[in-house]
Amino acid sequence: MEKKKVVLAYSGGLDTSVAIKWLQEKNYDVIALCLDLGEGKDLGFVKEKALSVGAIKSYMVDVQEEFANEYALMAMQAHTLYEGKYPLVSALSRPLIAKKLVEIAEQEGATAVAHGCTGKGNDQVRFEVSIQALNPYLEVIAPVREWKWSREEEIAYAKENDVPIPIHLDSPFSIDQNLWGRSNECGILEDPWAAPPEEAYEMTLALEDTPNKPEFVEIGFEAGVPTTLNGTAYSLAELIKTLNALAGKHGVGRIDHVENRLVGIKSREVYECPAAMTLITAHKELEDLTHVKEVAHFKPVIEQKITELIYNGLWFSPLKQALHAFLQETQKNVTGTVRVKLFKGHAIVEGRKSEYSLYDEKLATYTAQDEFNHDAAVGFISLFGLPTKVYSQVNQKKVEA
């Protein structure tokens, strides 16, 4: 019987390594795909490990710039903070991984793709809905969800099948990391009353270990895109990495969040997003300077919906594409420089300037240079307050009657 091909999203960890053997037992030839999203792993080792475990082919694809420009950028421009806190670190990478799975599957003539998600997380939804949107004819296999093994049973299977067991398997934490940040769950973090131990963090310093002097950075934007740090031009991926180091040193971007998952449960996770939180803060301030009031007041409504769509795995939905078009239109004049102070866990904007600034000092000032027409206020107040005045007059007459 001829074997079918399946493309597996491969991380190098125990679950996806065991999945290679498990899929082989199901009569599949496994093609492993590992993406470099900026997490800092030795992905050359991961690529070779997939082959040693039994994959017939192994891909390692550097998608850092694509992830930065096509995914993280939109999240920054939409100020996506799920439930006001979470910058969508993992949720942003899933549609890109799904896209690459589909591309390799079509290239290799595979009939299926596979992922290593469990049956109780958000990621299974994000992967599978994205894959269905891109190629509804591909079969999607979720080995970890199907085999329902305990950790002990999985380790026993790995030993029986000569699957290398990671040396850090005894770590209590489940970690996911990319350019946009780092998420951490499980272990002691499952107790929402327990303080996260310092070993749960990697990208940021504890406040007591951060410098006692602030550091200032100037972030340059062109049409909503961060392009420079302190006057030096960077690609977007490199700018994010550089800012992660700068802001992380000052403890910026630590987030402890009990969130409502798509699958109906609450989970407690710890995030580190130094660059993401700094860029979102700076970008919002530049928009405040360059957007007219109507756009400034309406855009948060769109931002909330975009955030929900991305979190819920609907990156490739028609609504998200339509809202993205609105978002892009709002960025045309978001050009300028924002000065940010990094200090003791905070990214504080202390200055902003733009050639498209709608702030007119001569209209805003209370000094002798004031050019605002104060006499116009009388007529404006009369017309603006007219509906309220008429309503009050009508009801006053009814009371008197």
Swiss-Prot record:
- Which residues bind L-citrulline per the record? Y86, N122, R126, S174, S183, E259, Y271
Gene Ontology cellular-component terms listed: cytoplasm
For this protein, the record's InterPro entries field holds: Arginosuc_syn_C, Arginosuc_syn_N, Arginosuc_synth, Arginosuc_synth_CS, Arginosuc_synth_type_1_subfam, AS_cat/multimer_dom_body, Rossmann-like_a/b/a_fold
Give the organism's phylogenetic lineage.
Answer: Bacteria, Bacillati, Bacillota, Bacilli, Bacillales
Q: Name one Pfam family in it.
A: Arginosuc_syn_C
User: What EC number(s) is this enzyme filed under?
Assistant: 6.3.4.5
The answer to keyword Lipoprotein applying to this record is no
Q: Which residues form the signal peptide?
A: none
Q: Which organism is it from?
A: Bacillus cereus (strain G9842)
Reactions listed under catalytic activity: L-citrulline + L-aspartate + ATP = 2-(N(omega)-L-arginino)succinate + AMP + diphosphate + H(+)
Instruction: Write down the Gene3D superfamilies for this protein, in alphabetical order.
Output: Argininosuccinate synthetase, chain A, domain 2, HUPs, Single helix bin
The UniProt subunit note reads as follows: Homotetramer.
Q: Which PROSITE patterns match?
A: ARGININOSUCCIN_SYN_1, ARGININOSUCCIN_SYN_2
Q: What is this protein called?
A: Argininosuccinate synthase
Binding residues for L-aspartate, per the UniProt record? T118, N122, D123
Listed CDD domains = ASS
Q: Where does ATP bind?
A: A9, Y10, S11, G12, G13, L14, D15, T16, S17, G116
Its annotated pathway reads:
Amino-acid biosynthesis; L-arginine biosynthesis; L-arginine from L-ornithine and carbamoyl phosphate: step 2/3
The gene is argG
